[in-house]
Amino acid sequence: MSDQPLTEAEIELALSDLPGWSHVGDRLEQTWTYKGHLQALAAASAVGFLSEQRDHHADLTINYNKLRVSTTTHSAGNKVSAKDTDLARAVSDLLE
């Protein structure tokens, strides 16, 4: 998969197939809300394992019952690449 940054048009096209995800700065982000902290923690753990398998690691933020997943490609100059859209799709499949 390419480390080249995506264009704005490519990002918007990818987001049309990624409900709930947003392009924020140079990242893709989505936040999930759970019943409680333990459910958010379990979801974060699952995303962590998925990220490790793909060797593309998302930033995870837990705020009690909310999990925010944020991804960018460091080797693409901290820009959004196909690695990010692919990871976003996989995370959505995992958590929804």
PLM regions: where:
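Short amphipathic alpha-helices within nucleic acid-binding modules
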Residues: L38-A44
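N-terminal first-folded block
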Residues: S2-Y34
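C-terminal structural segments of small proteins and small subunits
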Residues: R68-E96
